[in-house]
Amino acid sequence: QSVKESEGGLFKPTDTLTLTCTVSGFSLSGYDMSWVRQAPGKGLEWIGVIYASGSTYYATWAKSRSTITRTSBTVBLMDSLTAQDTATYFCARGHTGLSYLKSSVDVWGPGTLVTVS
């Protein structure tokens, strides 16, 4: 059972980022899936989750600019980029929520670097 993010790359502010998380070995219909990011030198920052039911929930800062969707075997993140969004982006199985002490994540992707300049 694994998840893997698509390639990131170099973007400009106001670009729209689209990342795809491809899953293998399990069905998305049975799991919540989260997107998380980590800026250089910073801690993990939760972006949002798509629940097994298909409904979504976002961090307050991401609510107006991020969209998480899914297909049968992928989870997509779309985000309107700003200059502050350089980070490694991770897909994770489970719901990190706002507190990592209460995280239910059990599978992490390797991450993909997104540079905004």
Swiss-Prot record:
SUPFAM superfamilies: Immunoglobulin. It comes from the Eukaryota. The modification Pyrrolidone carboxylic acid is found at residue 1. GO terms for cellular component: extracellular region; immunoglobulin complex. Keywords: Adaptive immunity, Disulfide bond, Immunity, Immunoglobulin, Pyrrolidone carboxylic acid. Disulfide bonds join 21-91. It holds the Pfam family V-set. Gene3D superfamilies: Immunoglobulins. One of its GO terms (biological process) is adaptive immune response. Residues 1-106 form the Ig-like domain. This chain was obtained from antibody to type III pneumococci and was isolated from the serum of a single rabbit. This is Ig heavy chain V-A2 region K-25. It comes from Oryctolagus cuniculus.
